[in-house]
Amino acid sequence: MAKGLDCGTSYYITATEDSIKKQRNVFLTVDGDANQVKRMLKRQRIPFVEKAGKVHIVGQHAFNYAQIFSTTELKRPMSQGLLNPKEKDALPVLNAIIGELLGKAKGKETCVYCIPAKPIDQTREVSYHEDVLKQIIETYGYDVKV
């Protein structure tokens, strides 16, 4: 069965013949003792990424926590439809979001994903964005098509 992946700035959405899943494209860095934070998040089955000693809650859970703690800043791994160059932890966060939505491929499954067109009025490069997403999706065992 093939899967489709729409990599939007606000949401990532996957679709198959019979289902649609979406995940917010945001993350939240949690301050405090990383080991203690990870234990708490694991107990509550909240998806997170650890990078350089920092713990990041990803997706809808990050959004929910930000609503509770209003002084907390949500971050986006993408900006204007492309990878956010200002977020150094964007890649592991995107990997977690994509992995949660797609899961491991079953056999020779195909995943078709979309990227934005190269704008005519800006000097943004989409090929790096395309290559990074392809590489992430391939790590889950999919045959990838753009």
Question: Predicted segment positions?
Answer:
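Nucleotide/phosphate-binding catalytic cleft detector across ATP-hydrolyzing
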Residues: 1-55, 60-146
